[in-house]
Amino acid sequence: MIRPEFFIEKLRENGIDCYAGVPDSLLKNICAYITDHCDEQHNIIAANEGAAVGIAAGHYLATGKPACVYMQNSGEGNIINPLASLTDQEVYNIPVLLLIGWRGRPGVHDEPQHVKQGKVTTGLLNVMGVNYEVLSKEEDKAEKQIVKAIKALQNKEVFALVIEKDTFEDYKLQNVEVNDLAMSREEAIQTVAAALGEKDCIVSTTGMISRELFEYRAAKGQGHEKDFLTVGSMGHASQIALGIAMAKPDRKVWCFDGDGAAIMHMGSMAIVAQKAPKNYVHVVFNNGAHDSVGGQPTVGLKIDLPAVAKAVGYKAAISMSSKEEMEKELSTLNSQLSTIGGPILLEIKVKKGNRKDLGRPTTTPIQNKEALMAFLKN
């Protein structure tokens, strides 16, 4: 395997010292090393992958030096437009080094949401005219691939290094941003889920939130038909919930969101607000971290999410960080929806981390979809 310090030093020797991106589980060791060894001016954890390409382009325009964009392959969709209309050699001709974690590689077992993306990862690069190398796990071979990448950048090309599982040696994040919040996300999810009505449904975002909701239902002996577990498509749970809420105005629809996911496509909040579904509750479990992929920080706890929600038109927005506050707000929520309508935002600040024995959904995405559709139909 490759030592993270070896890889980053080779990039530094060749003039690459600026990074932007969205953390990925396959890249967690290299992302952790970058977080520990680059200041905030040279490592920007972006809202989404397309935004990271924009940051890299801006860095090049200002310095003449290419930047490195790190991401999971699930984020390829977010970079298609800036690759085609910003960095492409027929447009602005801006070099960028892409570091792409290859989830769902053919022949390697992975979760359902990664299978299709894994199949098309290199094909998308080919279609976009992006040359790439699957990074070797041997340092001497990897060094030669880095040299090839640097030559491409010198020719003002975009070049991708595609990263398989277990490419980088373990590296534990040292500069961990610890919040002093007492409540776990799992406890918060259980508290909200327990307050739901019989006809209510939940759209939960990707990562730990959906996994913890699934386990709550299982522990209570309940079915999963009321929950749409958005195992992929990060950042879009609020819009899935909006689509349901508008089509089913007689049902209360809850979006269980994370801070990283909400920030990824924050403009969606404005659309929710302007459509103003009276049956829509947007719950953001905010721990200030990309918890599912290594714990790298988000700006979640550094911004005022309720103020953002109110500014775009949410009828109410409340922040809380204790079970007592939650139970108080949840007890009056129905009357608030009846009086002022929706959407309403509930920001619940929670501590980082999850149970080590946390499982994954045992139903398939298709089974989950069909059960929810039957529930909504009845």
Each model region followed by its residue ranges:
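Short, basic, low-complexity termini and linkers enriched in Ser/Thr/Gly/Pro
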Residues: S331-G341
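Thiamine diphosphate
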Residues: M1-N126, V130-L242, M246-R251, V299, ...
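A short alpha/beta connector and helix-capping loop motif
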Residues: A84, N93-V96, M266-N286
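Low-complexity intrinsically disordered segments
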Residues: I348-R355, G359-P361
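A contiguous pocket-lining binding segment that forms or flanks enzyme active sites
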Residues: N279-G313, S319
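Residue-level marker for buried hydrophobic side chains located in beta-strands
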Residues: I202, V253-F256, V283
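DG-centered beta-turn motif at the end of beta-strands
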Residues: M71-S74, R251-A262, G267-M269
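Active-site regions of oxyanion-processing enzymes, predominantly non-cytosolic
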Residues: E157-V162, G341-I348
